């Protein structure tokens, strides 16, 4: 690994059951077996990112634990994340800690809300993130299961989310184990979700949505796509949605997962994605008479009832977010309602730029500048994302005990920086610690 790990280590029996029992006793897990986060597993994950293990992504709620890359890697190792998928886990947490996602409220509410990860980009298949039949459960893609689980474990073990204590969720939901799926981009007639967020189509992007659950919709009767869209809108506007608890419907987003067969039909009936979204918004309402008197009173006080006695769910069409995924069986859609307190967030995935092998080779060459004088260079820290390396000059050879024969640090530094910049193929911020300087 690039630097020595800071986390303490434990020695236990080489038995999966032993670690499983330990994880249950310590409260690290979610009730399902975990993989032991061995040095080898954690190191393999760390080599997949350009970030230093000590780099902090942010503070994870609810207890504001510092999410260092090392701690994220430990939890990802327990979840079974493959090294190639680790940068996606980091990107998801980068999105999660943004204030707009409001993760502190999400992790402590009585609601069942939990982050859902939606992935776009060319790595979907390589990482085995499901987007066809069974993509929201049952397809068994390793990426789908482990990436979402890693984020949940980080909230538990780094953020301190504990059911019944810091988390007051009344019911929870299956997605609290972890929910991650991808968009079936090749079957979508519209720009991808990532493109709509401003990313290029060839970028790997993860989008976080605060989802209250997965609500299935089925229609075996309507052949007309506009009638189908009408019924879909009515289902989304269910009477006790969180949107009807707010002063306005101008909050959060609702993800509408549409199977490829329905998506093709909607694309023929509506000229653009925006016109389809506007049609859904226009018909996502219920008559005020649907509610009981106590509900009606609150809705009227909040000025949610229009002149025709309709209560619209959302204010803007872009709050209804179609995503194409699922099998080819048609007949079904799924919508993921928001709890209205989180704004959907997207982040690009960044892989490693310096591998451990590349850095080791660069350091080996740099060490030749001082070893002939009986000195050495010790790596203290490396942060590829920031282009920063911290080295310590070690003088220990008895023939040069005072270090007088070794060039001063201020003279050595530009020579070492030149070697590292050339081997690492980029500008470098080098700090050289010379213990001979008081």
Language model region names:
Residues 39, 348-438:
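Domain-level signature for proteins that mediate thiol-based redox and metal-cofactor handling
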């Amino acid at each position: 690994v690039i630097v020595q790990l800071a986390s303490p280590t434990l020695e236990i029996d080489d038995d999966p059951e032993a670690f499983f029992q330990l994880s249950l006793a310590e409260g690290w897990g979610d009730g399902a077996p975990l993989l032991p986060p061995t040095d080898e597993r954690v190191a393999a994950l760390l080599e997949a990112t350009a970030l230093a293990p000590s780099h902090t992504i942010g503070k994870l709620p609810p207890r504001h634990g510092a999410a260092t890359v090392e701690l994220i890697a430990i939890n990802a190792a327990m979840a079974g994340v493959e090294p190639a998928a680790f940068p996606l886990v980091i990107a998801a947490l980068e999105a999660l800690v943004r204030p707009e996602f409001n993760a502190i409220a999400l992790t402590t509410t009585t609601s069942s809300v939990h982050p859902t990860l939606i992935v776009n980009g060319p790595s979907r298949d390589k990482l085995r993130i499901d987007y066809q039949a069974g993509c929201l459960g049952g397809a068994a893609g390793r990426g789908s299961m482990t990436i979402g689980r890693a984020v949940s474990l980080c909230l538990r073990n780094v953020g301190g989310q504990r059911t019944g204590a810091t988390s007051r969720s009344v019911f929870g939901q299956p997605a609290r184990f972890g929910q991650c799926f991808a968009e079936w981009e090749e079957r979508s007639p519209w720009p991808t979700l990532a493109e709509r967020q401003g990313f290029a189509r060839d970028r790997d992007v993860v989008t976080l949505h605060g989802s209250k659950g997965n609500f299935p919709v089925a229609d075996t009767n309507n052949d007309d796509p506009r009638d189908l869209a009408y019924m879909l809108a009515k289902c989304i506007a269910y009477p006790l949605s969180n949107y009807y608890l707010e002063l306005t419907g101008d909050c959060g987003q609702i993800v509408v997962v549409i199977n490829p067969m329905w998506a093709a039909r909607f694309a023929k009936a509506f000229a653009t994605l925006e016109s389809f979204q506007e049609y859904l918004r226009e018909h996502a309402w219920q008559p005020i008479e649907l509610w009981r008197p106590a509900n009606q009173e609150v809705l009227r006080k909040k000025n949610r009832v229009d002149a025709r006695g309709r209560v619209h769910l959302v204010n803007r069409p872009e709050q209804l977010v179609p995503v194409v995924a699922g099998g080819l069986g048609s007949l079904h859609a799924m919508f993921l309602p928001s709890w209205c307190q989180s704004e959907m967030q997207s982040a690009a995935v960044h892989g490693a730029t310096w591998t451990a092998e590349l850095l080791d080779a660069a350091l080996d060459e740099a060490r030749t500048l001082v070893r002939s004088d009986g000195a050495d260079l010790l790596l203290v820290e490396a942060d590829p994302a920031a282009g920063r390396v911290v080295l310590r000059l070690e003088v220990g050879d008895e023939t040069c005990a005072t270090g007088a024969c070794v060039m001063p640090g201020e003279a050595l530094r530009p020579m070492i920086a030149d070697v590292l910049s050339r081997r690492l193929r980029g500008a470098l911020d080098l700090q050289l610690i010379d213990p001979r300087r008081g």
